[in-house]
Amino acid sequence: MAPPVKGKRKQSEEGEPLDPPVSPQPDGEPRSRSPVRLEEPPEAGREREEEQEEEQAFLVSLYKFMKERHTPIERVPHLGFKQINLWKIYKAVEKLGAYELVTGRRLWKNVYDELGGSPGSTSAATCTRRHYERLVLPYVRHLKGEDDKPLPPSKPRKQYKMAKEPRGDDGATERPKKVKEEKRVDQLMPAKTKTDAPDPARLPSQETPRDGMEQRGPAAGPSLPFLGASGCPEAYKRLLSSFYCRGTHGIMSPLAKKKLLAQVSKAEALQCQEEGCRHGAGGEPQAPPAAPPLESPQSPGGPAEDSRHRLTPLEGRQAPGGGLWGETQAGPRPSAPVVTGCFHAYPSEVLKPISQRPRDLFPSLKDRVLLGPPAKEEGLPAKEPPLVWGGDAGRPSAFHKGSSRKGSLYPKPKACWVSPMTKVPAESPVPLPTFPSSPGLGHKRSLAEDSSVHGSKKLRAVSPFLKEANAQECGTKPRGPDLAVSCLLGPALPEAYRGTLLRCPLNFAGTLGPLKGQATLPFSPLVIPAFPAHLLATTAPSPMTAGLMHLPPASFDSALCHRLCPASSPWHVPPATAYTAPHFSFHLNTKL
């Protein structure tokens, strides 16, 4: 152990002279540099001391001035995650050329970089400028002997935003602009009132030909208020367009646009009120008389029929026929007055326009047996006061085109267009056309079918549904004394009158259910003969005409559920009758 120690000492002793030549180089450098370092600190220290003294004096005077100004600096804000050094920001701005130059050249981001803020900040320049303006700028202007003048515009790059002005000039700059805008609106408003003033006077003369072309009726009165009301939006659009054209504002800020629109809307509201008063004075007195002309031609029965429009749902459905008859008298007319004047909609029913004239031709029918409405209407009141039906038999209705006579007395599900049937050639043995019908309607028979079975021998053993129809419709549905169901409408008919009951749907309301969603087919003139009113009236002493229903030539909605076949015998004139009584053969369960 000892020898190696001695050896190490020897090596260290021998190595001692070798160390100095190696060590002087690193030692010499610090020795040569040390005098420089020792010389610099006094100068840097003096500068630092001077800067610190100047900074302290600046901060003391700054705080004192701001306190005297009644805007004391209570807390120095942070900028870029660092507290702002007011001395540094002051020196940086002075180095770049004072506040006005930095603002004009947009160098506030450079000031922020010198303060050592984070480089990724997007609002660095704006925040730096605001802090400088609030904390340092008043004192800097005090040092330079400048007055505390208002600040320059905050965002000179975006000058189109007129509403946002510097804080000091907000009130002073916006007031003249508002005055100018109000002057423009005032200049435009008299012009618009001058141009719009003669409009109410022109409306009756100019717009009546248009209404005459469109309506051809007495409905020109109510159109005036609508035209007057629509005049205001047009004037508003014209005013806005002319305002923007004459204003020449260029690009406007949203706030300025809102202010402009508010001013224009106020002025236009006043104008619209004035125009409304004028239109109300000119057009509204004409509107109330226009309502009676719309209802008067549509209700030929007079006040008695108008009062019946609102008695019961059943009677309400019977009312529209009168209105439809009146519609053809006054000429074509818009659909809105017709709907509001006549039709009464019920939630569970289909709107059914009808013709009511058979009551006029056969007054004895109201004392006879009437077939009632379908089963779903059993709960409805069944009172039927005597009707006052107006009109003559020669006037067609809107729904029965070309027919010289109205249809049945009872409600039908739909209205369909029917070709004329009044004039049937006496020598026409042409077979009847066949109509397609859905197989699902086979078991839905009307009472006309059953009554025709009782009246004619050919139909007795044909249909397999006769017992079912008799049991359901004839035997099990009593509806009261006035609406008693009967399969035979009178005594047994002589042979000459059997053809008169052919396929006549005596209970049209019975077919409401199956025919609600289906289209109806028009009849050919050869299907059912239309007996003139005077011929049937001449046979009134006979028991048959008192119990017969009038054969309606109009649209038979029960046509879809009937199976019609060609006629088996031509028309002939029996010796005992004064009019033709056709005989038809029907095969009821034939599927077409």
Swiss-Prot record:
Query: What PROSITE patterns does the record tag this protein with?
Result: ARID
Instruction: Tell me the Pfam families matching this sequence.
Output: ARID
Q: What ranges does the record list as Pro residues composition bias?
A: 286-295
- Which parts of this chain are annotated as the region Disordered? 1-53, 143-225, 277-333
Record cross-link Glycyl lysine isopeptide (Lys-Gly) (interchain with G-Cter in ubiquitin), residues: 82, 91
- Give all residue intervals belonging to the ARID domain: 52-144
Q: Which residues form the signal peptide?
A: none
Does the UniProt entry include the keyword Nucleus? Answer: yes
- Looking at the UniProt record for this protein, which Gene Ontology cellular component terms does it annotate, in alphabetical order? nucleus
The record's annotation in SMART domains points to:
ARID, BRIGHT
Q: Which GO terms describe its molecular function?
A: mRNA 3'-UTR AU-rich region binding; transcription cis-regulatory region binding
One GO biological-process annotation of the entry reads: regulation of transcription by RNA polymerase II
Q: Which CDD domains match?
A: ARID_ARID5A (cd16884)
Alphabetical keyword list: Activator, DNA-binding, Immunity, Innate immunity, Isopeptide bond, Nucleus, Phosphoprotein, Repressor, RNA-binding, Transcription, Transcription regulation, Ubl conjugation
Provide the record's note on post-translational modification.
Phosphorylated by MAPK14 on serine residues involving a TLR4 signaling pathway upon lipopolysaccharide (LPS) stimulation leading to its ubiquitination and proteasomal degradation.
Give the domain of life: Eukaryota
Where, subcellularly, is it found?
Nucleus
Residue list for modification Phosphoserine: 23, 253, 438, 463
Principal subcellular localization? nucleus
Q: Indicate the quaternary assembly.
A: Interacts with SOX9. Interacts with ESR1. Interacts with RORC.
Q: Which PANTHER family match?
A: AT-RICH INTERACTIVE DOMAIN-CONTAINING PROTEIN 5A (PTHR13964:SF25), RBP-RELATED (PTHR13964)
* Reported function: DNA-binding protein that may regulate transcription and act as a repressor by binding to AT-rich stretches in the promoter region of target genes. May act as repressor and down-regulate enhancer-dependent gene expressison. May positively regulate chondrocyte-specific transcription such as of COL2A1 in collaboration with SOX9 and positively regulate histone H3 acetylation at chondrocyte-specific genes. May stimulate early-stage chondrocyte differentiation and inhibit later stage differention.
Entry protein name:
AT-rich interactive domain-containing protein 5A
Whose protein is this, by species? Bos taurus
Instruction: Please name the taxonomic classification of the source.
Output: Eukaryota, Metazoa, Chordata, Craniata, Vertebrata
Q: Report the gene name.
A: ARID5A
